[in-house]
């Protein structure tokens, strides 16, 4: 299958809390739920989802303000908080009638949202596959040194110009954390939701300001602490897709999640957006994980 720019499946739309949200929903059976983070969309999973064809209902949602989902209006510095994203995604997942045998496949902010949802709906979770994830609250010392200054700038007033005007998260952070060069078609797909300067790009700025680092923001730190404690004891089957060299889930963060029970680990090539470097390896590992959970 390997690399390709063509999206997977057909975008569907549903009204959630007065806004139109976009998602992919292909196949039948118990769901395999793929959730992206910042600044991506369901497009991130296009070369991975085909590996799971025939294993269940393949769902990938675009977070509010991202991908083909509507922007929030009015917008501003107080919008697109973790809590607001969770409210919209919880409502969307509820509307999709996921049932009680859900396999979660999560990355980046999708991991925070997915781990949090799983802790709150543990009786409905069949398994969790995760990669480049926020496995616990962070300290700045955990954050990759080469990006520390930039992410601290995002959390200051300077972030407004860096992201809302210069589109740094899409133009610099995204391609900089992929080992291969993206094609023009691939970059165009990632740029498309954020072409207009200003508030259209607000989601990609609010997200780095919500990362649970050094005790801030307190609500997200508490959520990450709660799910970290739960995952470190939960018997729910887990697949940890480790990245080499990796970016976020390294060092202490990786050491911690490696202690989680009932877990399988594989390693693939990649920095942070590893779906763009190792889609076949990731897809094959997820498919094998699901087959173990759902023997024919």
From Swiss-Prot:
Catalytic activities: 1-haloalkane + H2O = a halide anion + a primary alcohol + H(+); (3R,6R)-1,3,4,6-tetrachlorocyclohexa-1,4-diene + 2 H2O = 2,5-dichlorocyclohexa-2,5-dien-1,4-diol + 2 chloride + 2 H(+)
GO cellular component assignments: periplasmic space
InterPro entries, sorted: AB_hydrolase_1, AB_hydrolase_fold, Epox_hydrolase-like, Haloalkane_dehalogenase_2
Subcellular localization, as worded in the UniProt entry: Periplasm
Organism superkingdom: Bacteria
Record bears the keyword Nucleotide-binding: no
GO molecular-function terms, A-Z: haloalkane dehalogenase activity
Pfam families for the chain: Abhydrolase_1
Active site: 108, 132, 272
Domain AB hydrolase-1: 31-155
Pathway(s) of this molecule: Xenobiotic degradation; gamma-hexachlorocyclohexane degradation
Main location: periplasm
EC identifiers of the protein: 3.8.1.5
Coiled coil feature spans: none
Keywords: Detoxification, Hydrolase, Periplasm
Family in the record: Belongs to the haloalkane dehalogenase family. Type 2 subfamily.
Subunit structure: Monomer.
Role played: Catalyzes hydrolytic cleavage of carbon-halogen bonds in halogenated aliphatic compounds, leading to the formation of the corresponding primary alcohols, halide ions and protons. Is involved in the degradation of the important environmental pollutant gamma-hexachlorocyclohexane (gamma-HCH or lindane) as it also catalyzes conversion of 1,3,4,6-tetrachloro-1,4-cyclohexadiene (1,4-TCDN) to 2,5-dichloro-2,5-cyclohexadiene-1,4-diol (2,5-DDOL) via the intermediate 2,4,5-trichloro-2,5-cyclohexadiene-1-ol (2,4,5-DNOL).
Protein name per its UniProtKB record: Haloalkane dehalogenase
Native organism: Sphingobium indicum (strain DSM 16412 / CCM 7286 / MTCC 6364 / B90A)
